[in-house]
Regions:
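Catalytic cores of the polymerase beta-like nucleotidyltransferase superfamily
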Residues: 1-159
């Protein structure tokens, strides 16, 4: 088990998240949709952070095949659109991108923040994004390249 650290107000390191390795989470690579993998890979190749998030991670951890794969990144919708020609920006309150592969649509959103109390396009960090998710089991992030589950809020324990 690994840990992800941040800093407190005094600059001291504080544990922020538990990182589960492939040997610990046992998610088989073949259960990851190859197009979802490509989206994460291409975002990373362009210098962005990207993860599979939410219900797909929960389903993978309990041995189910997810019905859809949502992806979250630090790239803004306009940057995502530039990387994927096969995409369209949707939404009024919070803009996100649908990336289309054949008949499959992948929802790619930017990390969101609720720090200022807004519900619209308030982009944030992964630390802020995790706090706005509905349940701990839907606040799990999976990096399919490194094969790591990142858990900020005890979602793995709650499963």
């Amino acid at each position: 088990m690994l840990y992800r650290y941040g800093k407190d107000n005094n600059g001291r390191p504080v544990k922020k998240a538990v990182v589960y390795t492939r040997e610990e989470h046992l998610i088989p690579a073949y259960k990851i949709d190859p197009d979802a993998f490509k989206i994460v890979q291409r975002l990373k190749d362009n210098g962005y952070t990207a993860y599979i998030v939410g219900g797909a991670v929960r389903d993978l951890l309990i041995g189910k095949t997810p019905k859809d794969f949502d992806i979250v990144t630090d790239a803004t919708p306009s940057k995502i659109k530039r990387i994927f020609r096969n995409s369209r920006i949707i939404g009024r309150r919070f803009r996100l991108v649908h990336v289309i592969f054949g008949l499959k649509i992948f929802e790619v959103s930017t990390f969101r923040s609720t720090i200022d109390g807004s519900v619209g396009n308030s982009f944030g960090t992964i630390d802020e994004d995790v706090m706005r998710r509905d349940f701990t089991i839907n606040a799990l992030y999976y990096d399919p390249i490194l094969e790591q589950v990142i858990d900020y809020v005890g979602g793995v324990r709650d499963i």
